[in-house]
Amino acid sequence: MKALLAEATWTPKKQNLNKNLGVVGSLAWKDPQFKIVDKSFPVLRHDEVLVRVKYCGVCGSDIHVYETDKQGYILFSGPTKLPVVLGHELSGEIVEVGNEVKGFCQGDIITTESILWCGHCTACRTGMPNQCENVGLLGLTVDGGFAEYITLKAKYCWKLNHLQERYSFEEVCKIGTLIEPIGCAYNGIFISGNGFLPGAFAIVYGVGAIGLGAVMLLKAAGAAIVIAVDSIE
């Protein structure tokens, strides 16, 4: 199958060799290259679903794997394991389910979480999976959605079938790619930020996908005035 692969040269910065920070992309990976490759078809495990990818959004994180600083190191500063198939804002259709998977079946339209939490560490057990001590990142530490097919653990997947009551298959899949960035906005406003009282004024700095999602969420939750600010290039 075809996939977009990101590669780079493993060159940890000298000042960080003894700090156990090598997994941080901007401290370790240099001279990135992107290329279309033929990859082996993914092998389905017992707790996974096989998904035919329909759409996958391009996140700023993906761009920061390509962009570099003056020394040639990638700009992305989170966990990174290269080479990897990029892409985490994806949607698609399930074509096969593992023999231990419940709640999903062939033909389901799904999207997925991008933070791959373990479910066992202290952070996960206390309801903070985005702080997982064993976290993986879809499309950054494991192969992501810029491919024809992908296998995903069922526990990370969310069904979108109910949206077909109002939207076409194509439209539902497009909506599915926006759930991850809008979920980031939701987490920032209502989980980390503890929400706000109806009638409040709000300012959003930056109106990319996450910022626009924040604007919509703020308006839906009762903000009286929402001001969006961005730079003009």
Tell what function each PLM region has.
Residues S77-P83, H88, C118-F201, Y205:
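NAD(P)H dinucleotide-binding glycine-rich loop of Rossmann-like/cofactor-binding domains
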Residues V65-Q71:
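Short Gly/aromatic-enriched secondary-structure transition segments
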Residues S168-F169, P198, V204-V207, V215, ...:
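Adenosine-nucleotide cofactor-binding segment
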